[in-house]
């Protein structure tokens, strides 16, 4: 039988059955009743998982060595596994209010190990979560002395700290219009007792802005007891804004433009304060330090801020050498440094004010000082009496003459 290309399918009847001659004979595979294929194994399922999830699964085990040196592993407790999961997703937690403090301390440490407070994406929310629930336990005292770069980089995170009792911002160059003023004068820092604002380029306008919420709305810094305003451009006019601090007990005005005159004495008499004869130890910054759960977080921020690469000053020095001004600039810088050192050496006498009760209840050193003064007075009077001329002394009596003749 001849089959052409133009012809279609040809069917032939054989043994009473009709079949197609031109079509390719295909055999359908028999149906399989298996649930899994022959090459399916549990190991293949593990290999298909992402590497990150496998690394997290290893955290659920504790690997140890026994005395024989063989490796053994044990499964962590359900509490530890749950704590790790919450720490990995702490930024998605709604609230920790009512959560036990002991568990919160462990959760804070676990989140710190995972870098939740160092990442800019999660640091602000994570700190806010803990500060709203535990307040001063997270951070009670914050020392940012001369850390102006840290303030500019971590301003949003610093704003989350509530219930601070001591804040040291000495030498941070804030000026009169810094964004941190809103945080200092907010209700979040109504519990602040000590505030160090020395060497911040503050003027009377900055002091007015700092005290505005207390003077107008009676909010913010209402419990302030110690204030450091040393080395700022503050005059007698700016001191009138301090009358709103009813609980103020100690004030430092060293290195300012305040002149002691009769009007200033009247102002401090109205404040119930007097000039301290000896420098107060509260303004030495020795007792101020960072305290709380977030102490290591602040240190880690400072370390990461210090790791930022510095700009190469080589193009600048090359330009100075090309124009022949390197020597001139160096001389100017040296002269400025010498003048600054001279000003630091020739600092004014510490001007510390305190409440009259505190001044009256002086330390034992003050008592010894007063006794020393009284002794000096006695010695001076005796010396004056001995140095007096003979003519001004009383004449000898008859009994005195007889007594002298008996010798």
UniProtKB/Swiss-Prot annotation:
The lineage of its organism: Eukaryota, Metazoa, Chordata, Craniata, Vertebrata. The keyword Repeat applies. Keywords: Leucine-rich repeat, Repeat. This is Leucine-rich repeat-containing protein 42. The keyword Repeat applies. Residues 360-389 are annotated as: Disordered. LRR repeats lie at residues 138-159, 163-184, 191-211, 223-243, 247-268. It comes from Danio rerio. SUPFAM superfamilies: RNI-like (SSF52047). Pfam families: LRR_6. The gene is lrrc42. Belongs to the LRRC42 family.
């Amino acid at each position: 039988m001849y089959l052409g290309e133009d012809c279609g399918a040809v069917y032939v009847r054989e043994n009473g059955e009709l079949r197609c001659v031109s079509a390719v004979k295909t055999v359908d595979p028999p149906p399989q009743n298996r649930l899994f294929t022959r090459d399916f194994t549990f190991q293949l399922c593990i290999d298909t998982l992402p590497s990150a999830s496998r690394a997290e699964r290893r955290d659920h085990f504790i690997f140890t060595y026994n005395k024989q040196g063989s490796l053994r592993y044990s499964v962590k407790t359900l509490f530890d596994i749950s704590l790790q999961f919450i720490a990995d997703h702490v930024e998605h937690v709604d609230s920790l209010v009512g959560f036990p403090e002991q568990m919160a301390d462990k959760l804070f440490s676990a989140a710190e190990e995972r870098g939740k407070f160092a990442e800019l994406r999660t640091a602000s929310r994570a700190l806010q979560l803990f500060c709203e629930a535990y307040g001063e336990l997270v951070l009670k005292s914050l020392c940012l002395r001369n850390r102006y770069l840290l303030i500019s980089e971590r301003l949003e995170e610093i704003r989350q700290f509530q219930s601070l009792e001591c804040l040291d911002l000495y030498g941070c160059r804030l000026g009169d219009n810094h964004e941190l003023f809103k945080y200092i004068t907010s209700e979040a820092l109504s519990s602040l007792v000590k505030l160090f604002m020395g060497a911040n380029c503050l003027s009377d306008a900055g002091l007015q802005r700092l005290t505005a919420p207390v003077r107008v709305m009676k909010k913010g810094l209402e419990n302030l007891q110690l204030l450091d305003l040393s080395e700022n451009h503050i005059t007698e006019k700016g001191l009138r804004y301090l009358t709103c601090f009813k609980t103020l007990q100690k004030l430092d005005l060293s290195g300012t433009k305040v002149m002691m005159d009769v009007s200033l004495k009247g102002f401090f008499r109205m404040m119930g304060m007097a000039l301290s004869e000896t420098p107060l130890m509260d303004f030495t910054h020795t007792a101020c330090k960072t305290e709380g759960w977030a102490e290591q977080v602040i240190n880690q921020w400072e370390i990461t801020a210090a790791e930022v690469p510095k700009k190469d000053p080589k193009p600048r020095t090359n330009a100075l050498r090309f124009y022949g001004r390197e020597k001139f600039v160096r001389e100017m810088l040296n002269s400025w440094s010498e003048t600054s050192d001279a000003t630091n050496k020739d600092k004014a006498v510490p001007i510390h004010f305190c409440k009259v009760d505190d001044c009256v209840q002086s330390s034992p050193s003050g008592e010894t000082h007063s006794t020393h003064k009284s002794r000096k007075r006695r010695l001076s009077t005796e010396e004056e009496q001995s140095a007096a001329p003979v003519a001004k002394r009383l004449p000898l009596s008859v009994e005195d003459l007889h007594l002298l003749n008996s010798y």
